[in-house]
A protein has these predicted regions:
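Short, polar/charged loop or turn motifs at beta-strand boundaries
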Residues: 45, 63-86, 108-114, 145-151, ...
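N-terminal periplasmic "start-of-domain" segments of outer-membrane beta-barrel proteins
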Residues: 45-76, 103, 132-143, 192
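Extracytoplasmic beta-strand/coil segments of soluble accessory domains associated
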Residues: 86-132
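Outer-membrane beta-barrel transmembrane strands
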Residues: 114, 209, 266-307, 377-422, ...
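Short acidic/polar hinge/loop motifs at secondary-structure boundaries
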Residues: 126-165
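Transmembrane beta-barrel wall of Gram-negative outer-membrane proteins
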Residues: 203-378, 382-400
């Protein structure tokens, strides 16, 4: 595997210096020697999670919080944020998800081996909405879980990531049983940065190109506006060998094996294209004790992976109805209500020239009979994927009163949408009229949250510090939508009674009966007490 990367920091550059840097990059690519433009890490890192006291450092926090700085992401070879975190946080796990249905589009990530929706994800301390995909093939950990889509955020937009594992549920509720990850966006009011990264594992395998930029600027004299953008494309990888059944069919005389001589079934990372991510973070001091904040993100990407190979002799519901003893022969007249006239055809044990091959040729010549071997003589492997879009906006006002009461009023809204697509497959129940590409439908997750938070230090003589009393209220609306797909993707066709499968093979579409909107409202209150018993 090889990777090349370059980072340009134009915080203090003039135009001639910036042009010179870009020209130098155009002339030569050097091996990746990443360096940080963030400067030395602060000795006292202020944390947001794990405590509700104002401006506590990581050393003073009562809960163990890990800090991953933004500069740490520059040193990673991957272009995907989840893969970067996997190398930096030992208890964070995410797979490449080959052949995993909808989980191919939004990969489920988890902490400490618990389901993804047991991990609370925050951005700038505010709850992030969940992804639209419910993982049905999650490796035994994420099955049935619905976690946040972390890949929708660009790594260049991050100032740091705070990770809290122990005691998170006691402070933040059952959503945080596995822990909390707080993604803190950059807040510089000047300068910027450009990152360019490219590479591949081997020729034609896993090629990646990524360009990202960040710029900070003043927002009046008392604020900042920081923007980040990333554009990326990643080719699919293949760690496959030829399936033994596909090779046996080819050796037996079937020269139409799907994708031959390449593996009939690909096992590897999916292709990710048109991957666009954008983040904005804005802050403004309204006065000495009050500030306004606004931040959000938008992202979209297309993902294309594969499914398992459909053997042309024994695949149920398509090529056979009895495990491969006989071929599944469709009878047009029977589908119309007449008597069946098409014969039973055994699957050949040898190659071309057998008696059953002769019978198969006769079926192909009979307009009343059909087999899907005519459409896919060497079998087929469906290509599955779709497009994912994600956006979120949060805004609020925080500050303090003359009496020392801290407050934070905020509102946020976020949506994640997955539109599915499958091709190189068919709906067996539709017979020879079946299309080979389908839009099975969509999942949409929408969440709206309103928070009111207060905290105040109360002097208590028996403690080494003030007793911090925090309390608050949250209201959250959650809405999950299933959008119906193409009629052909879920339709029960006239050949169903003859043993042919229903719906687009591999990923059946969502019918109008399955489509709908499900929502609920959540109310929560909390009280939090914190003090230093000793110095």
């Amino acid at each position: 595997m090889w990777r090349y990367s370059m980072k340009i920091d134009f915080k203090m550059m003039d135009k001639s210096q910036l042009l010179g840097s870009l020209t130098a990059f155009a002339l030569i690519l050097t091996p990746a020697l990443p360096f940080s433009a963030f400067g030395a890490d602060e000795v006292e890192e202020v944390v947001v999670i794990g405590t509700r006291r104002e401006a506590r450092s990581i050393g003073d926090s009562p809960a163990p919080v890990d800090i991953i700085s933004g500069s740490d992401f520059v040193n990673q070879g991957s272009g995907d944020l989840q893969d970067m975190i996997r190398t930096l946080v030992p208890s964070f796990n995410v797979n490449t998800q080959p052949i995993s249905d909808a989980a191919t589009l939004v990969r489920p990530a988890n902490l400490r081996g618990l389901p993804p929706d047991d991990m609370l994800v925050l951005t700038n301390g505010k709850r992030r909405h969940r992804g639209a995909v419910i993982s049905f093939l999650g490796g035994g950990v994420a099955d049935g879980a619905q976690g946040a889509d972390i890949s929708a955020m660009p790594a260049i937009a991050l100032k740091k990531v705070e990770v809290l594992r122990d005691g998170a549920a006691a402070q933040y509720g059952s959503d945080a049983i596995a822990g909390i990850m707080n993604f803190v966006y950059r807040d510089e009011a000047e300068g910027g940065e450009i990152q360019i990264r490219t590479g591949e594992y081997s020729e034609g395998d896993g090629g990646m190109f990524r360009i990202a930029a960040n710029v900070g600027m003043p927002f009046t004299a008392d604020g900042f506006a920081n923007f980040s953008v990333e554009l990326a494309d990643s080719d699919a990888t293949s760690r496959s060998i030829q399936r033994t059944d596909a090779q046996a069919l080819y050796d037996g005389g079937n020269s139409a094996i799907w994708n031959y001589p390449n593996p009939a079934q690909v096992w590897g990372s999916p292709e990710v294209s048109d991957d666009v991510k954008f983040v904005a973070n804005i802050g403004l001091d309204l006065d000495a004790s009050k500030k306004f904040y606004l931040f959000g993100n938008y992202g979209e990407r297309k993902v294309l992976g594969g499914f398992y190979y459909r053997n042309p002799t024994n695949r149920g519901g398509i090529f056979s109805a009895d495990g491969g003893a006989t071929r599944l022969v469709g009878d047009v007249a029977e589908a119309a209500g007449a008597a069946r006239t098409c014969p039973v055809v055994a699957v050949p044990e040898t190659g071309a020239g057998s008696a059953s091959d002769t019978a198969l040729a006769e079926i192909k010549a009979n307009p009343n009979c059909f087999v899907f071997n005519e459409m896919f003589p060497g079998g087929f492997t469906p290509s599955f994927g779709g497009s994912v879009s994600d956006w979120a906006v949060a805004s609020g006002v925080s500050g303090s009163t003359d009496s020392g009461l801290m407050y934070d009023f905020s509102v946020s809204i976020g949506e994640n949408r997955a539109d599915f697509y499958i091709e190189n497959t068919l709906n067996g129940s539709l017979g020879p009229d079946s299309p080979t590409a389908f839009n099975p439908g969509s999942y949409v997750q929408l969440e709206k949250t309103v928070n009111v938070d207060f905290s105040k230090g109360v002097p208590v003589d028996s403690f080494a510090s003030d007793l911090n009393v925090a309390w608050g209220v949250e209201y959250r609306e959650e809405q999950f939508t299933v959008v119906s797909g193409d009629e052909e993707s879920w339709e029960i066709g006239p050949y169903f009674t003859q043993g042919f499968g229903i719906g687009s093979n591999g990923f059946g579409g969502f019918s109008p009966q399955m489509a709908g909107v499900w929502d609920r409202g959540n109310y929560a209150v909390y009280v939090d007490l914190e003090a230093d018993v000793t110095e």
